[in-house]
Amino acid sequence: NTLHILPIHQPGKMKAMGTAGSLYSPMDLLGIDPNLIDHNDSRSDKEQFKAFIDECHKRGIKVMLDMPSCASYDMFLEHPEWMAMERDGLAKTPQGWNDIRMFQPWEDEGKRTLNPKLLELHKEYVDMCIDLGIDGIRADVARAKPVEFWDVLIPYSRMRDPEFGWLAETYTYEDASPQANMPYDRPQDSLRAGFDTIYGQYHIFHEWPNAKTFTNYIKEQLEMSYKLPKGKALIGSFATHDDISPMFHGGADYCNLTMGLQATLPMLSPYIVDGYQSGDYYVYPYENTQNQNTDTDTHEMTVHRGQLDIFNLSRKPGGNQPEIGKFMTSAFALKDKYADIINKGTFIPLEKKGDKNDQIIAYARHLNGKTLLVVA
């Protein structure tokens, strides 16, 4: 079991989104947000965080920390040597995210020479994580750095901790990026560079028109895995913090459907966002209202409707349908009971009769004479 913790750094205050600032617009990659610290505790911020990680480990839970791909405007002003610039000298900003500024991974892109100062910052980040006892890193928008960057950073982490894990936020092969100022996505390249796990495309499951589309995607991922070292996998990215609540796609039934799939699919580690287990719609009454109390230079309480609020001091996630969590628990119990078949068995799509619109998913998992049948 692994706990994925969203970025812990103090958000930037300038040109911010929300009254707390985005978790992905850090002021200091090597610092901890004072809002996360108990100021009545005599221990330092990192001592408190390490104690939290130690308690996770006592419970058999590993901890993965989310590493932002970009910087705040505050960091851009303080450390221009790390930052990417447009030809007119202005900061480079990824399309749709006006509160963050992109790093410059290259010293000379033509010669494929990395920016040594940015690389050193990220090595210090890795050192911080390992010193705290963190077990791995989720690399936000992994394609924002070239393969050469990861070719250095990932082996560096494993010189200190051979078991250190890496999850790449990378989705699907792109000939060209649809997003301005953002490189194209190449999941297979990320896995070759040393990432253990990727996001994949399950977040668009609700858009797939039929079971064949779903099955073909699984086959594509399995075929990709045959070209890579053993052990590469996807997370069950049916709903991450970047997506709207699965409750909007069909309520508790949809949540249970996707959890049953997550528990039985090949090459997949189940993944949930806090609040899923009780049916949180992530709807906030203060959405896009004005608030006189703010920690940033804006009074607007920016919210992406239906998504976990990462811009304001918010409530604890939670909904009103605990039966989702009960089904999740039973699905995980099934995955544990048949771990050998699910983790090592073959994936066999099954023929169906009478399903004219191809809406029924049916497959078997088979290993050493044992077969697990899945119908959804």
Q: Model segments located where?
A:
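Hydrophobic faces of well-ordered beta-strands that scaffold small-molecule active sites
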Residues: 3-5, 63-65, 137, 166-168, ...
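Conserved, mostly hydrophobic/aromatic
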Residues: 5, 29, 56, 129, ...
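Substrate-binding/active-site clefts of carbohydrate-active enzymes
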Residues: 7-132, 152-153, 158-161, 165, ...
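Active-site beta-loop-alpha junctions enriched in small/polar residues
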Residues: 8, 68-70, 142-144, 169-173, ...
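The substrate-binding groove and active-site-proximal loops of carbohydrate-active enzymes
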Residues: 25-46, 100-119, 134-144, 202-211, ...
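Active-site-proximal helices and loops of the catalytic beta/alpha 8
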Residues: 53, 57, 61, 124-127, ...
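Loop/helix patches that line or flank the sugar-binding groove of alpha-linked glycan CAZymes
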Residues: 237-240, 245-376
